[in-house]
Swiss-Prot record:
GO terms for cellular component: cytosol. This is Alanine racemase. Pathway: Amino-acid biosynthesis; D-alanine biosynthesis; D-alanine from L-alanine: step 1/1. Transmembrane segments: none annotated. It catalyses: L-alanine = D-alanine. InterPro entries: Ala_racemase (IPR000821), Ala_racemase/Decarboxylase_C (IPR009006), Ala_racemase_C (IPR011079), Ala_racemase_N (IPR001608), Ala_racemase_pyridoxalP-BS (IPR020622), PLP-binding_barrel (IPR029066). Substrate binds at residues 127, 301. It comes from Dichelobacter nodosus (strain VCS1703A). The active site is at 34 (proton acceptor), 252 (proton acceptor). Its EC number is 5.1.1.1. GO terms for molecular function: alanine racemase activity; pyridoxal phosphate binding. Belongs to the alanine racemase family.
Amino acid sequence: MRALKKIINLNALRHNWALIKQRSLPATPMVVLKADAYGHGMTTVAKTLDDARYFAVSCIEEAIALRHLGIDTPVVLLEGVYRADELLLCEYYQFDTLVHNFRQMQWLKEFNGSVKAWLKVDSGMHRLGFTQDEIAEAFAQAHSLPVNIQWQGVITHFACSDEDDLTHAKKQLACMDRLVLPAHWKRCYANSAAIFALPQAHYDYTRSGIMLYGLSPFMHGDGSAYGLQPVMTVITEILAVRHLEKNETAGYGQGFTAPESGWLATIALGYGDGFARTITSGAVPVLIAGQRYPLVGRVAMDMAMVWLGSDRYAEGTIVELFGSHLPTEEVARAAGTIPHTLTTMLMPRVHVEIVGG
């Protein structure tokens, strides 16, 4: 079996979930499972968190997959339906749909079945949702729909709740607080960062995404600073070790030049596994025997290279790419990206090992 694998720690997942429930109070947290639970395995996460009151996914395909697992927990579609006929599936499977534009509102008007819906408001993200110029008309149309359309509440999304300066997030919250809602409508505003940074935005429901998987929702630090534990650890092995003299080159296009006499390791990791060819720059670390070493040269389809300098390790030595001992956030920053991209990028051929079951 190929050495590259991701290890999913269910004990860490349960720990994070317990923390989220406590930090979300008085709200109830939704579990965000989009993109295969941020690469952690939607099936595994959903079955482990069997006390969750709500799941949130991007699209109807993800929601149907949950139902096929026998999971009957309420599910909300964060992008709503893409076609009018998907409302029939929402009714059949008992999904909640988000409504973020007038096209979707028209589909609801024409729908003869029964469905639960949430109204999405663009409070300043300027991505999805009814804008401030549209919101009055959106509410008027929502209130005019027959009782078969069961409005659950209103949702928005913060653009900058993960930053030190919360000015924009607070402006968005003030925008939402000006809305006059029916008494039974619920409010779902806070994402992972806002669960920590904006307790005044908790209201009825929060949405726990990246923090559920043990990673910091902020632009700095790592999850451990907030009591979180990484759920995913990705490891591989050294396949070969070569000694290079100073200025000797290695890899495609002679992409690496040895800065001095030393050792170069080849590891089982490539863009065929989902590891982007552009990630290695000499700044991205891996962890071997507790020491950090840089990825160098060009990532190939199945292999990458690590400069060991004067150190030497045997073939078969474990290499941690990110996770329990090498923070995913640190690797992401070095790669010029965010942790979400690292956990979601890995391809199906990467073996998965579940621990803590």
